[in-house]
């Protein structure tokens, strides 16, 4: 009930032609089988099979003043849905993406640089007994960036971007960012941008649940990072603000099917913070990290919290390494999370704390074995309604570096 089996294969090869040119090839193959959980013995068991293929060819040309990266990629996804695991598939579909991208950088001098990016992709989709015939879409974009570093303590970046999507109107986008090293212990980082996202094939055609009436999503966002450093300590504190028009969100509908829809206006603000400590002494290394995230994300029209966006999240990591052995611990607290915009406490996900711990042992030069206990305190918790995650479980791995 709810079992799954995932397999992934990766391969990568690179060849340096000369001092200026390098080519590389990377490929990933993935297969996954997911049995959806049932909540009573009378329900019919269902399953979902997905297959993914990714392949990327990369040509990197570099001189003292010029760097150009040209990429060609092919991506393919296929899914099969079985409304009864003992019968033939009831629906399915496949998507193919052909992609070409060129990233050109020119260094004018030590203070000024330019970046031009062009991209084109052809998207194709096909369905099986899902209401989808053959669909196809052309999309592309051009972007320009200017990087200016007037001094070692100050740098800025500004950019413009225009998307071109078949049958969809697109706005001109912009971004601006900068960093100021005020002194040796404090830095200020700021970012502001206008962003755009058009509905993907999954958003439009996924069956069951796709929505052909979706609008494109636009947003304005800004954040202000504050970085403090003292000896072995680093502290990052970043307030942020986001305003989104026609936000695309996948949520369960009245029939229990996950489906995307637009939310007219969403306003989100909050704070991200993280404290880090690193100390080396002899063969010893100690690391500690503690973070807190506060998010207030609401539908402006209803003034209610968005579902599946917790207000409070705390996370931490600690590790100690001596020579060839390392022990570590990871912890996360997730606050109360609403699962619908009516803010019903009865259906909200309860807050939870999960902790993992383990060790790594390095054997010889190229081998490392690891052991890990997940959900150490055997908590019962959910990140999605009605889908409880595993209780205490264990994992072992072997890492070989060639």
Which positions does each model-derived feature cover?
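Transmembrane beta-strands of outer-membrane beta-barrel pores
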Residues: 29-33, 63-65, 74-78, 120-126, ...
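Gram-negative outer-membrane beta-barrel transporters
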Residues: 151-153, 241-243, 262-341, 365, ...
């Amino acid at each position: 009930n709810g079992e799954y089996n995932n397999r992934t294969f990766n391969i990568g090869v690179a060849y340096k032609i000369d001092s200026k040119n390098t080519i590389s090839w990377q490929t990933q193959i993935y297969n996954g089988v997911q049995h959806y959980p049932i909540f009573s013995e009378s329900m019919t068991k269902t399953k979902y099979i997905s297959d993914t293929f990714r392949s990327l060819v990369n040509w990197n040309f570099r001189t003292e003043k010029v760097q150009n990266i040209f990429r060609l990629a092919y991506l393919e996804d296929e899914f099969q849905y079985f409304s009864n695991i003992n019968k033939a598939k009831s629906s399915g579909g496949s998507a193919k993406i052909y992609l070409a991208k060129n990233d050109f950088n020119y260094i004018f001098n030590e203070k000024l640089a330019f970046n031009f990016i062009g991209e084109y992709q052809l998207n194709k989709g096909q369905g099986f007994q899902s209401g989808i015939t053959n669909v196809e879409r052309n999309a592309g974009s051009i972007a320009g960036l200017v990087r200016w570093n007037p001094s070692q303590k100050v740098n800025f970046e500004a950019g413009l971007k225009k998307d071109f999507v078949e049958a969809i109107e697109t706005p001109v986008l912009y971004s601006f960012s900068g960093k100021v090293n005020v002194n040796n212990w404090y830095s200020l980082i700021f970012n502001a941008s206008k962003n755009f996202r058009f509905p993907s094939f999954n958003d439009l055609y996924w069956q069951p649940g796709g929505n052909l009436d979706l609008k494109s999503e636009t947003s304005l966002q800004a954040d202000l990072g504050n970085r403090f450093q003292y000896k072995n300590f680093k502290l990052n504190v970043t307030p942020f603000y986001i305003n989104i028009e026609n936000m695309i969100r996948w949520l369960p509908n009245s029939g229990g099917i996950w489906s995307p829809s637009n939310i007219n206006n969403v306003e989100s603000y909050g704070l991200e913070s993280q404290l880090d400590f690193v100390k080396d002494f002899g063969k010893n290394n100690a690391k500690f990290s503690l973070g807190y995230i506060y998010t207030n994300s609401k539908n402006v029209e209803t003034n209610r919290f968005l579902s599946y966006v917790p207000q409070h999240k705390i996370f931490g990591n600690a590790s100690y390494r001596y020579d060839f052995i390392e022990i570590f611990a990871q912890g996360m607290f997730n606050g109360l999370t609403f699962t619908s915009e009516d803010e019903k406490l009865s259906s909200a996900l309860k807050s939870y704390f999960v902790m993992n711990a383990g060790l790594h042992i390095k054997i010889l030069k190229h081998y490392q074995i690891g052991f890990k206990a997940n959900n150490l305190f055997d908590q019962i918790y959910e990140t999605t309604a009605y889908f409880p995650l595993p209780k205490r479980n264990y994992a072992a791995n072997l890492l070989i570096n060639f």
